[in-house]
Amino acid sequence: MLPPFESDETPGNSLTLLSGAPAPVGVAICKDMDFIRPALDYGRAGAALVLDPAWDFSVDRAWHGHIAIMRGVENGYAVAHTAKNGFLTVTDSRGRVLGEVRSDRAEFASLLVDVPVQHQDTIFDRYGAWFPGLAGLLLLVAVVQLAMVWRRSASEAI
């Protein structure tokens, strides 16, 4: 939650999957897609499309929508990101933009596209967030080695 603006709100603890569609359709809300979870959980639940209503701001309008696209690619589902003050963007499960229109230039904006509704299994879907942890570990090893080289160079210079 974003203090102090959302301090009185309570975060959810379950996924929202719409029934009646030919494939599972998830509903995330705005900031949800900025994090690995619940985006990963929707992928593991087999979601083929995630609807992502948002209220993007002028500062983050492009960035925020593109994070949602990345989450769709990571987890194998199409994304419909509908922002009040940003972009209406629809992508397939591989991140290809199927349609995009600005929603902050007129009183009303609409976008109509055909979306392939099929979940694609991904490595991230199956194994989770191991890569960021591995990258962090490799960075730590590199920093330690660099510190050792600097220390050695400093002692040899004396």
Task: Identify the residue ranges that each predicted region occupies.
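Enzyme catalytic cores with a strong preference for nitrogen-chemistry domains
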Residues: 1-158
